[in-house]
Swiss-Prot record:
This is Putative multidrug resistance protein MdtD. Belongs to the major facilitator superfamily. TCR/Tet family. PANTHER family: BLR6921 PROTEIN, MAJOR FACILITATOR SUPERFAMILY MULTIDRUG TRANSPORTER MFSC. GO terms for molecular function: transmembrane transporter activity. It is found in: Cell inner membrane. GO terms for cellular component: plasma membrane. InterPro entries: MFS, MFS_dom, MFS_trans_sf, Multi-R_MdtD. The chain crosses the membrane at residues 12-32, 49-69, 77-97, 102-124, 138-158, 165-185, 197-217, 222-242, 263-283, 286-306, 342-362, 396-416, 431-451. It comes from the Bacteria. It comes from Salmonella schwarzengrund (strain CVM19633). NCBIfam families: PRK10504.1. Residues 1-11, 70-76, 125-137, 186-196, 243-262, 307-341, 417-430 are periplasmic.
Length: 470
């Protein structure tokens, strides 16, 4: 990194800053949800829409971000992403109702969707290929620190200021980032093929409508017949996209991707797997505060061991997969995550709070091994010509499945609980216990998919510490 020109190093710092903002925002909000509910006069059972609106918007917008950067320029799009994210943060802080907050989170999600993929594209264009791995390690490190700081920082701001400050802190940082981007980042553009707008709209409508249909009766009071119509419309949009992609060589995502068996299995497993695991970062701080009566700051601190376990496991997961193979690792970690989630609930309800950090550390380790294995299984056998498209589709599916997971978690809470549930009461404990039992089943089900993964015939390359630091 020291051999790079000064202006290139500054550009990498700007990208790293964008990664940090986006990753921090994905975790800082969860700790504040109970306080937001109280301030807005809403039931905590409805607050999952604050998370879903952001993550679903990211999923919808991801396919367009790379094309926009190539067409309009990486500087212009990265600048627009930071501005939209910052404006969304301002509107979030000014929101006086849940509906206003959800709309502001959608605007934030549009900016967040463009930040990370455009940042990766920027690094590819400004750094020589020989230094690409070192540069990506540098810019993604803040993205790993964001989830570590997010829960605790969110807890501090909520407890000692107000929930509005989890959004207000983005404003001065966003202004500085936007100015630095405009002044220092080059505006690379390349010739692009025509954007598949019909395919993009079909996928966007399908994803949004199906997610809305999952929880519309609880959160929005939509009638069952209307929900059935929404579900049918969403499914029809997805089917129309498949027909469109079959006939169109320039489709957003080519159906040739699914000729690779490991990609099909991995994508299906990733979708199902992240529905279950996507519930945990949302449900855990909510349960700690509403179910156990923890303060926001205490609940935020309890999330740190989970992030530390996740970061630590990334260093050894390749060796584990090489030793035991994808099928065994994925089946074991899927079932293991379900068991650890039940262990967490058991330890919490028994009052053994001193064991909770250890259980959450274990949960983070198991979840990280599962995530890394799912990602590499999905992409490892794709031909070079389809690798970029496959990676984009996987990124979209990851965000979509997490939004569905949070939606289902909120739906389960609403099904087992009343309109308002009390803090640290016996009835509340039962609501969360039944919810966690259902979550454990949902988390375990993808093991059926992963049991079909073929035996491995190829070892994964392990990057030494020396190469990591180059």
């Amino acid at each position: 990194m020291t051999e790079l020109p000064d202006n290139t190093r500054w550009q990498l710092w700007i990208v790293a800053f964008g990664f940090f903002m986006q990753s921090l925002d994905t975790t800082i909000v969860n700790t504040a949800l109970p306080s937001m509910a109280k301030s807005l006069g809403e039931s905590p059972l409805h607050m999952h829409m604050v998370v879903v609106s952001y993550v679903l918007t990211v999923a919808v917008m991801l396919p367009a971000s790379g094309w926009l950067a190539d067409k309009i320029g990486v500087r212009n799009i990265f600048f627009a992403a930071i501005v939209l994210f910052t404006l969304g943060s301002l509107f979030c802080a000014l929101s006086g109702t849940l509906n206003q907050l959800v709309l502001a989170r959608v605007l934030q999600g549009v900016g967040g969707a463009m930040m990370v993929p455009v940042g990766r594209l920027t690094v590819m264009k400004i750094v020589p290929r020989a230094q690409y791995m070192a540069a990506m390690t540098f810019v993604t490190l803040p993205g790993q620190i964001g989830p570590l700081l997010g829960p605790a920082l969110g807890g501090v701001l909520v407890e000692y200021a107000s929930w509005h400050w989890i959004f207000l802190i983005n404003i001065p940082v966003g202004i500085v980032g936007a100015i630095a981007t405009f002044m220092l980042m080059p505006n690379y553009t390349i010739e692009t093929r025509r954007f598949d707008l019909p395919g993009f709209l079909l996928l966007a409508i399908g994803m949004a409508v199906l997610t809305l249909a999952l929880d519309g009766s609880k959160s929005m009071g939509i009638s069952p017949w209307t929900l059935a119509g929404l579900a049918a419309g969403g499914a029809a949009a997805i089917l129309l996209y498949l027909l469109h992609a079959k006939k169109n060589s320039g489709a957003l995502f080519s159906l040739r991707l699914f000729r690779t068996p490991t990609f099909s299995l991995g994508l299906l497993g990733s979708f199902a797997g992240r529905i279950g695991s996507g519930m945990l970062p949302f449900m855990t701080p909510v349960f700690l505060q509403i179910g156990l009566g923890f303060s926001p700051f205490h609940a935020g601190l309890m999330m740190i061991p989970m992030v530390l376990g996740s970061m630590g496991m990334k260093r050894i997961v390749v060796q584990i997969v090489n030793r035991f193979g994808y099928r065994r690792v994925l089946v074991a970690t899927t079932l293991g995550l379900a068991l650890v989630s039940l262990l967490f609930m058991s330890v919490a309800l028994l009052g053994w709070y001193y064991l909770l950090p250890l259980v959450l550390l274990l949960q983070g380790m198991v979840n990280s091994a599962r995530f890394s294995s799912m990602n590499t299984l999905t992409l490892k056998d794709l031909p070079d010509t389809l690798a970029s498209s496959g990676n984009s589709l996987l990124s979209m599916i990851m965000q979509l499945s997490m939004s569905i997971g949070v939606t289902i978690a909120g739906m389960l809470l609403g099904m087992f609980g009343q309109q308002h549930i009390g803090i640290d009461s016996s009835a509340t404990h039962h609501v969360f216990m039944y919810t966690w039992l259902c979550m454990a089943v949902i988390i375990a089900l993808p093991a059926i998919i992963f049991a079909r993964v073929p035996n491995d015939t190829q070892q994964n390359m392990v990057i030494s510490r020396r190469k990591r630091s180059l």
